[in-house]
Amino acid sequence: MEVLPGLLRLLAALVVAERWARDTSGAESLGLWPLPFAVDISPRSLHLSPNNFFFGHSPTSKAGSSCEILQEAFRRYYDFIFGFYKWHQGSYQLCFGTELQQLQVHVESECDTFPSISSNESYVLHVKGPEALLRANTVWGALRGLETFSQLIYQDSYGTFTVNESEIIDFPRFPHRGILIDTGRHFLSVKTIFKTLDAMAFNKFNVLHWHIVDDQSFPYQSINFGVLSSKGSYSLSHVYTPNDVRMVIEYARIRGIRVMPEFDTPGHSRSWGKGQKDLLTPCYRKQVLSGTFGPINPILNTTYNFLSKFFKEISTVFPDEFIHIGGDEVDFDCWASNSEILQFMQEKGFSQISLNSNLCTVFKISNMISAMKKRPIVWQEAFDGRDKFMPGTVVQVWKIEDYKWEQSLITKAGFPVILSAPWYLDLISYGQDWKNYYEVEPQDFPGSDKERKRVLGGEACLWGEYVDATNLTPRLWPRASAVGERLWSHKDVRDIHDAYSRLTIHRCRMVRRGIAAEPLFTGYCNHEHRM
């Protein structure tokens, strides 16, 4: 990660002094989350007045007042800092002393349009009255710095908004820090997705993995194949219109979050078949049609003609460079029961008919995606140890059994990895299971340093069989926050007791901001008596 020019000496001094991410006394009391790389919080305090504080652009910033992303962020964070107490009749006073009147934001590059896997999210925060300074290479780093700045501010015993003089240098450990939501099993309203994106920004996640369709329903309203949702959705009101999709992408964009769509193939596709004739494989029982259908039919030209047109649409609707094409949990029995598929695969010389049918299908689709100047992501079943995928294909590891060995095999073959196996948040248990997620080390597997660097990051997955809008938010948060810190903070940030103290405060902060995050354990939030 590139660090801002002119700050390398300060960073080196912090590292030599071993102050980075280890002296957490101030961070613990404030609940900074995820913990920044380098934190130096002074006991000297500054006061803020809601009527006399504002965010502004540095005169030399290349992303100025015309940058909509920053202008929107200034409005959001002013409200996060002061708004709750306004609307809940909280009292605040301005005591004598130095007043912090402004946070100036300086961005080294012009206002970007969309974040990407290579976006620089580093920032430096210098808080000293009467003006604080936030410096970042990009607007995406500025957004992360604004979140940290908002976490520094608290109310003292007199109700005065207060911030301690601080120096913070920060950047993420991994570039891919995702949350997976599943709208194929249960439809989630756009409003619910917005709330998830808000919480993601509070925890510095930067990828919404949208598993948008599945066997049970097809809620994505295609521009070119509208019959897919009209026949495959739960109902005509359980669809995401093109405008809905645009709103989700835009809401995510101005928070520095990428939206990565997943359309799982060739399995998990029963809902597709309701609107696309001959797409699915007819299954047989004792050489007689059973009346059921299996995965996408891998031997018909019409299959690939349709998929090519469909994914061409997806590549234009979703601006992100990645498209997830699935490749997991394919019902091989149906393929093996179909004599036409058996004959086709035998003619191709495939010995493992079912496995090779899957690989053949996924390989063709991944080539389609690559031809569209996008990068495919697949689940680990699509990887068989051969370098058959296009360069740049990413493999997502989800099976908990031997997942470290799986990471080793994939990275040794030269492919990047996204880790999800230890972070399936839909698997709930009694107690503080967030600690299990927190203690995961994504690069702890047999391999060279070069191979470990192929880990792009990870995702916390919340599959939707038992999750809808009523329980999505409390099941995600603050359990996903543990994953967020593991993917953002330095690998040596592992003190579970310190994490508990900070996460307890951070959870209350999320609740104060409207996120129904469940409690970690017994206790209360300080803001409750004001409600």
Swiss-Prot record:
Main subcellular location of this protein, as a coarse class: other
GO CC terms, sorted: cortical granule; lysosome; membrane
Active site feature: 329
Pfam family, one: Glycohydro_20b2
Chemical reaction(s) catalysed: Hydrolysis of terminal non-reducing N-acetyl-D-hexosamine residues in N-acetyl-beta-D-hexosaminides; N-acetyl-beta-D-galactosaminyl-(1->4)-beta-D-3-sulfogalactosyl-(1->4)-beta-D-glucosyl-(1<->1')-ceramide + H2O = a beta-D-3-sulfogalactosyl-(1->4)-beta-D-glucosyl-(1<->1')-ceramide + N-acetyl-beta-D-galactosamine; a ganglioside GM2 (d18:1(4E)) + H2O = a ganglioside GM3 (d18:1(4E)) + N-acetyl-beta-D-galactosamine; a ganglioside GM2 + H2O = a ganglioside GM3 + N-acetyl-beta-D-galactosamine
Domain of life: Eukaryota
Glycosylated residues in this chain: 120, 164, 301
A GO biological-process term: single fertilization
Family annotation (Gene3D superfamilies): Chitobiase/beta-hexosaminidase domain 2-like, Glycosidases
UniProt GO molecular function: beta-N-acetylhexosaminidase activity
Enzyme Commission number(s) from the entry: 3.2.1.52
Record keywords, A-Z: Cytoplasmic vesicle, Disulfide bond, Glycoprotein, Glycosidase, Hydrolase, Lipid metabolism, Lysosome, Signal
InterPro entries in the record: Beta_hexosaminidase_sua/sub, Glyco_hydro_20_cat, Glycoside_hydrolase_SF, Hex-like_dom2, HEX_eukaryotic_N
Regulation: Addition of GM2A stimulates the hydrolysis of sulfated glycosphingolipid SM2 and the ganglioside GM2.
Enzyme class: hydrolase
Key word Hydrolase present: yes
Family from the record: Belongs to the glycosyl hydrolase 20 family.
Protein name: Beta-hexosaminidase subunit beta
Organism: Sus scrofa (Pig)
